[in-house]
Each structure stands twice: as C-alpha cells, then as structure tokens.
C-alpha cells in the first residue's frame, strides 16, 4: 500500500517537473488573431529568415521549433513565400527566441520552507527579438515578451529551461509570432517591393 503511494507520488512529481516551461494557462501577452488582409498573391511580400533559440535546444526540438515558426507564418497567409536564408526575398528577418526561468530569492525561500514537498509556481519568460529589413532599406527591431508559469517540485529543483513542444508552450510561442506579424503589418512590411 505504502509502496504504491510512493510510486504514485514519484510519478506525479516526475511528470510535473518534466512539464516544461508552461502550465495549462495563457501567457500575459494579449492573444492575437491575424485578420484577413485582402492582398493579391503578387502584392504579398516574400520573407527570408534566420531563427535561433537560446538556450540552444536539442537538434530534434530545434527542427520542430523552426517548423512551428514557419507554420504560423504560412497560416497567417500574409506572405507570398517564407523560407530560410539565404533566399532572395522582399523582407529579411533575423529572429532570436529566448526562454528563461526567473527564479527569485522568494521562490527559493518558499522551496526551502516547504522542504520541496509543495509545488512552487515560478515564472518562465519568453522573449522574441527580431530585426527586419525590407528590400527598400527600411529596418526595424522588435522586442516582444511573454510570460507563463512553471510548477517546480523537489525533483525539479533548481528549475531549468527545456524547449518543450507541448500545447501551452507552443501556444505562447505562436502568439509571439502572430504579434510580430501584426507589428510588421502596422509598419508596412507586407507589400511586395516590385522588380
């Protein structure tokens, strides 16, 4: 009986510590929906990008993260083409997405006070830094930030950063990408430069 209880507790603690950098909740950034922009295909701009992630994820996770980025840009239907650099395009983007767990002394004190037996919610911060350059020479830098929470138990202390492809983390990243696209739209990066 006690052995089953210990096994269940260990399983739950392991699952919670391996959950990643998000809980089933929305981030703090307002959820963005891309409106339908009535542009003819020949008027849409093409995009060439480089994207990196900090801290660097494992190769398989990085491939999934890049696919997620491309899918969100394709789903928006705002661009004629999106491809990784170096490709001739109307818009060139350099994107860096960082993820960090912001543990404060308060979190550590709470962890010590509970003896690691109580889950502690710590903030996980996503920051998207993008440098956008159009073929007309216009350059803009964007810094977009969002935050979600991570539950930490004794086996998960100190909390680290893992790039998980779970639905909540993915939702937060995708919303960052949509926010970037809306800011690009506002700043006039959606039109084809012409020949």
Regions of interest found by a model, annotated:
Residues 1-21:
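Sec-dependent bacterial lipoprotein signal peptides
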Residues 20-78, 83, 189-195:
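A structural "domain/chain start" motif
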Residues 27-29, 123-127, 131, 139-195:
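C-terminal/domain-edge helix-coil "capping" segments
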Residues 42-44, 88, 121-123:
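Short coil/turn motifs at beta-sheet boundaries
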Residues 46-49, 83-105, 177:
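A short, hydrophobic beta-strand-centered structural micro-motif
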Residues 53-55, 97-99, 132-134, 145-148:
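A mature extracytoplasmic/lumenal domain signature
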Residues 80-82, 86, 117-118:
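Short aromatic-glycine motifs in intrinsically disordered, low-complexity regions
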Residues 94-140, 162:
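Surface-exposed short loop/turn segments
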């Amino acid at each position: 009986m006690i052995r089953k209880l210990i096994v269940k507790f260990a399983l739950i603690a392991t699952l919670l510590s391996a959950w990643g950098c998000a809980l089933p909740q929305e981030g703090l950034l307002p959820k963005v929906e891309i409106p339908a922009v009535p542009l003819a295909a020949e008027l849409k701009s093409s995009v060439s990008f480089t994207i990196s992630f900090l801290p660097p994820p494992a190769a398989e996770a990085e491939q999934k993260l890049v696919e997620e980025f491309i899918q969100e840009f394709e789903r928006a239907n705002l661009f004629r083409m999106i491809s990784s650099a170096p490709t001739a395009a109307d818009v060139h983007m350099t994107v860096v997405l960082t993820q960090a767990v912001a543990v404060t002394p308060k979190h550590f004190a709470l962890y010590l006070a509970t003896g690691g037996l109580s889950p502690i919610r710590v903030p996980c911060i996503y920051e998207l830094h993008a440098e956008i350059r159009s073929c007309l020479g216009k350059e803009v830098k964007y810094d977009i930030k969002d935050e979600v929470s991570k539950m930490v138990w004794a086996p998960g202390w100190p909390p680290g950063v893992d790039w998980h492809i779970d639905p909540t983390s993915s939702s937060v990243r995708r919303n960052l990408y949509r926010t970037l696209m809306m800011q690009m739209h506002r700043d006039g990066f959606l039109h084809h430069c012409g020949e």
